[in-house]
Amino acid sequence: MGVISVQLVVTMVMASVIQKIIPHYSFARWLLCSGSLRWYQHPTEDELRTLAGKQQKGGKSKKDRKYNGHLENKPMTIPKDIDLQLETKCIAEVDTLALHYFPEFQWLVDFTVAATVVYLITELYFCVAEPSGEMNISVVWSLLVLAFVMKILFSLTAHYFRLEEGGERSLCITFAFFFFVKAMAILIVTENYLEFGLETGFANFSESAVQFLENQGLESQGPISKLTFKLILALLCALIGAFLTFPGLRLAQMHLDALTLNNCKVTQTLLHINFLAPLIMVLLWVKPITKDYITNPTFGKDNVPLMSEKTYDTLRLWVILLLCVLRLAMMRHHLQAYLNLAQKGVLQMKKEAGRISTVDLQKMVARVFYYLCVIALQYIAPLVMLLHTTLLLKTLGGHSWVIYSDESLPCLSNEDSSPAEVGQSQMEASQTVAQLSVALGGLRTVFSPLLFRGLLSFFTWWIAACLFSTSLFGLFYHQYLMAA
């Protein structure tokens, strides 16, 4: 019980932290209110009157019209080329109360931080204590994080479907079909080019499932066919692609604006690396381009591999984590580039002829700030998906964080051999408990690290591929189509 209680204590402490401390010391609130982000305030009607050269008059205006006893005020309009300078202000905590989706943003970020801390403590515990036959509770936390991310992305995508115009709805459906076809094409590529391990994992899953059912006295040819398995994966890929359509398109626009906003060469280089980060992740699983040149080089006389396959798998995990940290560090530049759209819209308005109502002008400026958390969610949700999918890949896939150690066995290997021993040791105490332990041990052999390694490698690669595809399309759209 002492071994099991360590993870339970960590979970209970973190749950208490989420409930008691995080509402007062929120990392999500710090990201927005640390003083590094400035938003543009919309002008008041009196300021617009003064700039337009109109004096505020008391009483009824001559332009007021009376219909059926009701007084109708015609909205005031001002010239579009008015000399308007927007005032900026640092985002304060009180300003976040008016932001749309701020509770969702705060919950996702703070819960992700808590889940990541639990994961780090649990990994340290497993490396030091090396418990056998114990479930890693950080897996549950990571799965909850992914569930919250999918819920929020679904909510944001559903918002586009509720719009009356319908352009966003058509774009989302189009990309969903595109990603479905793309996923079907990717799933037929042999593992000589894309080494996810799906084929090996599915074969191991089918054989173990048949053997498990036979041990239970049931006859079966397998739980699922390979075609059905890949069709389900393709449908999930289409759903993920639809959810990541608008985050990728928005990232492209913020990337272009952030490059214009920052003149520092180092910052611009980091912005370029951040934009190309999904492509780097995608190439890490393309065997002829990366892995073959490192683990089986063809140049030189000796053909000595630079590293083993296990070391390469570990290095791949570290590269993804570093790119996720870079994306989080570049978040402030992207959000500030988005907030500058208010000033950009006013400058564009000044180039146009005609008049605009004061209400429309105020809405145009205020809308940018009020939807800041929507943009922040579109930026950070894919990052959280990549991060915790990678963490699950390490834990459930049986990888290691140690690059130089090729002989160390992952903790999951010890777990696979322990359930039967635990069940046998308790057979004298309770026959029912023994049978349950054997059944759970059989399920662990069915859902083996090979299966999780293939699935999670594929989904990690797919999330990165969707992000790069949509952001590349957004870059082409904003750079060329909008300019034309």
Swiss-Prot record:
TM spans (from-to): 108-128, 137-157, 170-190, 229-249, 266-286, 368-388, 456-476
UniProt cross-references to InterPro entries, sorted A to Z: Transmembrane_161A/B
Membrane topology listed for this record: Multi-pass membrane protein
GO cellular component terms, A-Z: plasma membrane
GO biological process, any: regulation of cardiac muscle cell action potential
Phenotype seen when the gene is deleted: Mutants display highly specific cardiac arrhythmia and die by 15 days post-fertilization (dpf). Exhibit skipped ventricular beats, irregular beats and slower heart rate but their hearts are morphologically indistinguishable from wild-type counterparts. Increased potassium and calcium currents observed in isolated cardiomyocytes.
A Pfam family of this chain: Tmemb_161AB
Function: Essential for maintaining normal cardiac rhythm in the developing heart and for neonatal survival. Inhibits potassium and calcium currents in the cardiomyocytes, this assists in timely action potential repolarization and thereby maintains normal cardiac rhythm.
Protein name in the entry: Transmembrane protein 161B
Species, as recorded: Danio rerio (Zebrafish)
